[in-house]
UniProtKB/Swiss-Prot annotation:
Pfam families: AKAP7_NLS (PF10469), AKAP7_RIRII_bdg (PF10470)
Alphabetized UniProt keyword annotations: Cytoplasm, Nucleotide-binding, Nucleus
Tissues where this protein is expressed: Expressed in oocytes.
Name of the protein: A-kinase anchor protein 7 isoform gamma
Region of interest (RI-alpha-binding), residue spans: 261-285
Gene: Akap7
Binding site for CMP: T95, H185, L186, T187
């Protein structure tokens, strides 16, 4: 853990510095100097901690995303100045953990940590799906607007997953997490996206803008995927963040319905093919019989006509 690597005294004030021993060898002094440099770098790293990556739970339920778009449009109808403050399509997510990854090697370590996280998450969920229901609107000091995660047992499970993720990444030596308490939320707008708003007199998100959605139920999202995303790299064409790696939660359970659907589809295709073949066979059989049937009919008509002629002659 990166914070544990710093001596505990560094967090509690300056430690007592032992007096230099004049008999200490030059090599020992150099080793001590290297260790002090290492501690200073660690302290500087903590001070300069600027998260640039995060773990994301993507929100893909159309009911939720459509509801958020309706909410955003409702707000913009009341105040068009907020257009640039809105979170774009495809970017809706829950931030599970933030972290700092400074180079490609650290990104690779982060990818490994995410892979190690998967069995821990599945153990927490005990083979069950985690449904995340969203209801109502909230803000962070009037600066960030978000859809609330409804109360329930799912919150405890998500908090445990977030804490496990933080521990897993820190044990890999990654600076991760925040000092503030983790509060899962689904951001739909933030004023920091549009700094010019302050000059236009917009200093906070007014509650009246979203009052009709204050208790609105947006829907449920199943936790099925966790992504390691970049805050700074160019977003994907669908609007979602640049993704370094992903894990799928309960992958086996999610694939079974797909396999079952494929089986059902295959059966329907086979049944349709058989039915079509039978119909084609019957049509061909009828076509072969039709010429003979036609001659017989004509003969019968001829006999009837002949009988009629004889009768006339009589």
């Amino acid at each position: 853990m990166p914070f544990a690597a710093v001596d505990i005294q560094d967090d509690c004030g300056s430690p007592d510095v032992p007096q230099a021993n004049p008999k200490r060898s030059k090599e020992e002094e150099e080793d001590r100097g290297d260790k002090n440099d290492h501690v200073k770098k660690r302290k500087k790293a903590k001070k300069d901690y600027q998260p640039n990556y995060f773990l994301s739970i993507p929100i893909t339920n159309k009911k939720i995303t459509t509801g958020i778009k309706v909410l955003q449009n409702s707000i913009l109808q009341q105040d068009k100045r907020l257009t640039k403050a809105m979170v774009g399509d495809g970017s809706f997510h829950i931030t599970l953990l933030v972290m700092q990854l400074l180079n490609e090697d650290e990104v690779n370590i982060g990818t490994d940590a995410l892979l190690e996280l998967k069995p821990f998450v599945e153990e927490i969920l005990e083979g069950k799906h985690l449904a995340l229901p969203f209801q109502g609107i909230g803000t962070f000091q009037g600066q960030v607007g978000f859809v609330k995660l409804a109360d329930g047992d799912h919150v405890s499970a998500l908090l445990e997953i977030a804490e496990t993720a933080k521990r897993t990444f820190r044990e890999k030596g990654i600076l991760a997490g925040e000092s503030r308490t983790f509060k899962p939320h689904l951001t739909f707008m933030k004023l920091s996206k549009a700094p010019m708003l302050r000059k236009k007199g917009v200093r906070k998100i007014e509650p009246g803008l979203y009052e009709q959605f204050i208790d609105h139920r947006f829907g449920e999202e199943l936790l099925y995927q966790i992504d390691l995303c970049s805050m700074l790299k160019k977003k994907q064409s669908n609007g979602y963040y640049h993704c370094e790696s992903s894990i799928v939660i309960g992958e086996k359970d999610r694939r079974e319905p797909e396999d079952a659907e494929l089986v059902r589809l295959s059966k329907r295709l086979v049944e349709n093919a058989v039915l079509k073949a039978v119909q084609q066979y019957l049509e061909e059989t009828q076509n072969k019989k039709q010429p003979g049937e036609g001659n017989s009919t004509k003969a019968e008509e001829g006999d009837r006509n002949g009988d009629g002629s004889d009768n006339n002659r009589k």
